[in-house]
A protein has these predicted regions:
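Flexible loop/hinge segments at secondary-structure junctions
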Residues: 1-279
């Protein structure tokens, strides 16, 4: 059985116990949290192997057929370029300026109403975005005051979607100038429908994700329940296939998974061969 739950939901199910009624593996678009590891221990899931399967980037994307224009009505031929601070200002609940348009944030940006569809709290993409963008882009005053940098505004300019990326595409296609937050693999497989803004002047690319020069790059993981190894038929066949050269250099690469560096890959293979507990 394969079930789509989001990273948070997957860890919750994975940690609930050992046995055929519980998952063997959970995929996660961010590292397991300490509180999730503690939940696993409470559920009797004591031995866990962490597998870093590749890298990903988070795209701040809009409809591919939308033409951005500056405040003078002139076409922005190079697309739109946003900083983490500008995205935070557009999305943050505790931004006292409460901008209505991107122009309200910076005069170089278009007079287009801010409309952003964000992943739900259960999503690992949401966790990674909040850590890499909302927290990093948070204004100094908020950090000093120990405010909640990751809280989204609730006035209609930011809405939460579900786990189905297709709904995000539908939203930004209908509402021109709207943004959605996607993983790179989804962007790369839907370039006819969606395009990504630059972040801090850097375009999203496979190379930029692999070397982390793209500002919203992140690792991807799955977690193996060691108690199921040797009990559940085919479990290690699946794991070994997932990290094989054939997969990572062929069909997973075609699907948008960005490869690990040789050094990182060697560590992953060693951890799998020795079924090394990650904690």
């Amino acid at each position: 059985v394969i079930e789509s739950t989001g990273s948070g939901g997957g860890h919750k199910l994975f940690c609930a116990g050992v046995g055929v009624e519980h998952p063997d593996i959970t995929n996660s678009s961010r590292a397991q949290k300490d509180k999730e590891f503690a939940l696993c221990q409470e559920g009797g899931v004591n031995d866990i192997v962490e597998v870093r399967v590749g890298n990903d980037g988070i795209a701040f994307a809009y409809s591919a057929d939308y033409e951005w224009k500056n405040s003078n009505g002139e076409s922005m031929a190079d697309g739109i370029d946003l900083s983490k601070e500008e995205i935070w200002q557009a999305m943050a609940k505790d931004n006292s300026n409460a901008p209505e348009t991107w122009f309200d944030i910076d005069k170089r940006l278009p007079k287009v109403e801010i409309s952003i569809m964000a992943p739900p709290p259960s999503s690992g993409t949401r966790d990674a975005f909040d850590s890499l963008v909302m927290k990093k882009g948070c204004v100094k005053e908020m950090l000093v005051a120990d405010g909640d940098c990751k809280a989204y505004r609730e006035d209609g300019h930011v809405i939460e979607g579900g786990e189905n990326d297709e709904l995000y595409v539908e939203h930004i296609s209908k509402e021109q100038g709207a943004f959605g937050i996607f993983g790179y693999s989804f962007l790369s497989n839907n370039e006819d429908k969606i395009a990504a803004s630059k972040i801090n002047g850097v375009e999203i690319s496979m190379e930029g994700i692999q070397d982390y020069s793209y500002p919203i790059a992140r690792p991807l993981f799955f977690y193996i329940k060691k108690a199921h190894v040797g009990v559940i038929p085919g479990l290690m066949d699946y794991v070994n296939e997932f990290v094989s050269e054939e997969a990572t250099e062929d069909y997973l690469l075609d699907a948008g998974l960005v490869q690990l560096s040789p050094a990182d890959r060697a560590k992953v293979l060693d951890d799998i061969a020795n079924l090394k507990n990650y904690k």
